[in-house]
Amino acid sequence: MSDVNAVKHFLLSLQKDICQQLAAIDGGADFAEDEWQRAEGGGGCSRVLSGGRVFERAGVNFSHVTGKSLPPSASTHRPDLAGRSFQAMGVSLVIHPLSPYIPTSHANVRLFIAEKPGEEPVWWFGGGFDLTPYYGFKEDAVHWHQTAHDLCQPFGDEVYPRYKKWCDDYFFLKHRNEARGIGGLFFDDLNEPDFATSFAFIRAVGNGFLDGYLPIVERRKDLPWGEREREFQLYRRGRYVEFNLIWDRGTLFGLQSGGRTESILMSMPPLARWEYQHQPEPGSPEALLYQDFLPARDWLAESHTHNKEA
């Protein structure tokens, strides 16, 4: 598949571009680069910014790994592919800002190919992006979802609603009965209508991520905050850790396939905390997060209704 090289080139360019733009807006730290090889096949390049003015930690990882047999996390939904050799490539990133008023964000775009001698390769794309605020701002939520909607629109009216719901369903902590954040887009097993269109869609998602995120960073990075906001941010980061270690398929695939643990766990926040039976004060900004932002909402429909009324 000659198209695989084009995907790899795009992913490497995406990683470079995102790192350059994040370092520019941070202004206090740059990305350290760590190239690595995987004994079972393949390798990657992890880039991590730590201790910045804006970002406490930002990790942007590229990997292209190969293996002789699909791990259980990848073949559970496709038992017909069990035992096939595979290659997987992608860019995955998580950004943990210092300010509690800037949301944590995550994005991922990837290509997976399962191969068997004498048969056509089975391929699919996956990915998306999602936002995890600690303090909710409706303006930010609407902008985030408007960006997601607009990049999906050229691919069909049904794409944004479908992948928005998939994101709401996926980034949900079942053991807490609580969403991780306000969602965005999530998709997997994308192979229709063809390779070129699917590839065009992941380019739109990858390139659209910073269009959604950087304006929010700019709006919130200079807001003053104190110990109360920081403590709540660290408490909510605990939910991020719980999701990644218990529910996230990407984390499980990486660990089960003998992936590089340092790169897989790059998504973890540098600091987090847990508190027994924490309850936010009624009517507080912290309570508002649970009340108005974590329950799944159609942000764009509400925004359009409000604009018509105005």
From Swiss-Prot:
One of its GO terms (biological process) is protoporphyrinogen IX biosynthetic process. One of its GO terms (cellular component) is cytoplasm. The active site is at 106 (proton donor). Involved in the heme biosynthesis. Catalyzes the aerobic oxidative decarboxylation of propionate groups of rings A and B of coproporphyrinogen-III to yield the vinyl groups in protoporphyrinogen-IX. It catalyses: coproporphyrinogen III + O2 + 2 H(+) = protoporphyrinogen IX + 2 CO2 + 2 H2O. Coiled coil: none annotated. Its main location: cytoplasm. This is Oxygen-dependent coproporphyrinogen-III oxidase. It is an enzyme of class 1 (oxidoreductase). The gene is hemF. It comes from the Bacteria. Its EC number is 1.3.3.3. A divalent metal cation binds at residues 96, 106, 145, 175. Belongs to the aerobic coproporphyrinogen-III oxidase family. Its cofactor is a divalent metal cation. Residues 240-275 are annotated as: Important for dimerization. PANTHER family: COPROPORPHYRINOGEN III OXIDASE, MITOCHONDRIAL, OXYGEN-DEPENDENT COPROPORPHYRINOGEN-III OXIDASE, MITOCHONDRIAL. InterPro entries: Coprogen_oxidase_aer, Coprogen_oxidase_aer_sf, Coprogen_oxidase_CS. Pathway: Porphyrin-containing compound metabolism; protoporphyrin-IX biosynthesis; protoporphyrinogen-IX from coproporphyrinogen-III (O2 route): step 1/1. It is found in: Cytoplasm.
